Amino acid sequence: MLTLPNFFALKSLRKSIRIIHCMALGKLHEFKIFGIVQHAHLLGRAITTRHFRNGTELPPIAVDPNYDFDFQEARLLRTERSVQRGDSLMVECTYDSTARTTPTLGGLTTRDEMCLSFVMYYPKIPLTNCLSAPIYDSIDKDERAVWTTLKAYNWTSPQVRQTFKQKVRESSIHHQCIGAQMNPKYLEFVFHEYLPQEGYIPSSSTCP
C-alpha cells in the first residue's frame, strides 16, 4: 500500500500532490503488479500511480482521470507490471476543494483526505505499506510552528498558494516502509524529492 499520511495539509483549492514512494524489496530483485485499488475521499477528482526507473518515467501503473468516491473498485491490469529494485512509485492525487473555505487535512474521516494506492502483487514479501510525507522544514524547523503558520495563511491569495506550493517542493520528505502490525520498519529516512524534467509522454492514438 502506498499512502499519504494523516499529517499532510491539503490547501483549499485544486492541486496535485506528488509523493515518491521508494519500494523496499528486501532480497527480491523484482515483483509483479497484477491489480490495483486507488483511493481518495470526497475531494478526489483524479488519481494516477506513476512508475520511475533510472531517472526515467515509465508508463503509469494506473490512471483514473475521473475518480468518484462513490464508485471505487479493484482493477486487474491488462498486462502485469514489473517493479525492480531501485524503482520508485508515486501516487498523484488531484483534489478540488474550491467549495471549502478552510484548509483540508489528511486523515481518516470522510471530510479529511487521503491519497492511496493499494497494489496487488507477487511474490509475497513481508511488507504492508510504504508512506511518504513532506516535513515542511522549508517553512519552519519546528513542527508546531509550521501548523501555526499554515493556519494563519490567507489561502484566497494566489501568491500565498504559489509560495506554499514552492515550499512543499523544497521540503524534505520523510519516508518509511513497514511490515505487518507496523513492525518491523524496513526503511526509514529523509530525502529530497526528485522528478525527471520530462514526464512520461503517451503515444499518439491511432483511432480516427
Stretches with model-predicted labels:
Residues 1-208:
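Beta-strand-centric surfaces of beta-sandwich/beta-rich domains
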